Amino acid sequence: MKSVFLEEMAVLLKKMDNYRIIYHIRPDGDCIGSAYALALSLKSIGKKCKVTGEYPVPDAHISMTSKVLSDDIDDPVNIAIDSGSPDRLGIFENEQYTFCIDHHLDNSVIADYKYIEEDAGACSEIILKLIKLMGVTVTKDIADLLYMALVTDTMCFRTYDTTQQSFLTAAELAGYGADIAGIGRRNMFIKSKRRIALEELLKKSFHFSVYTAAKTARARTFNRTCTDSEPQFST
């Protein structure tokens, strides 16, 4: 396993031909947008590419990813995208990875070549720099995917890890024709993973409380009914 500079990774990616890009379980916009943008970029320079993961692409992103057709590939080179640990890769956890690209400092995925940029607000910031180093022409479709990835991971630039580079990346993608307004509107009310988990916990607690209250009420009603129906004996 070797950590490499982004320039080195760009050179290495251009040397090989068949790629399988694997995103993490319970995929979010950043891993999906980054994976499909990289796939489009590799295909644009003559490479064969397939994007996959244990979970399907979320419905919210299908309209953007459906334009990226997968190639039939034998013996592909595996690329792990935006996955901080092997277990995040799900059923692909035990695959052999040649490349790993991520922005999580504690990344533990084993790969021949790794590039980790912990200061990046989203993996898409890294992908944009990488494909430019590869000499890829950034099309509107690529820009849309990367902008979607950026706004979902930064929650429309509201997270603490949103940086100056995040805004510069957004401006650059706008220059490439990204649908800033449309993608922004569709992702305006994104919730953080922590908030979603909290809401799920509260929902379960609420349902449990309602169930417990209903069960208690039924028990009290039953007890009253039994008491009222007991035979009365005169003395």
Where are these regions (language model features)?
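Short alpha-helices
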Residues: 104-169
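Hydrophobic/aromatic residues located in beta-strands of well-ordered beta-sheets
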Residues: 49-51, 98, 146
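Short, motif-level signal for alpha-helix interfacial/capping segments enriched in acidic residues
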Residues: 3-10, 81-82, 131-133
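Hydrophobic helix-and-loop "lid/oligomerization" segment in the mid-to-C-terminal part
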Residues: 2-60, 71-76, 152-235
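Active-site cofactor/cluster-binding pocket
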Residues: 56, 62-113
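Glycine-rich, phosphate-binding/catalytic loops in enzymes
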Residues: 38-39, 95-98, 116-117, 168
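An acidic intrinsically disordered interaction segment
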Residues: 1-9, 87-95, 119-127
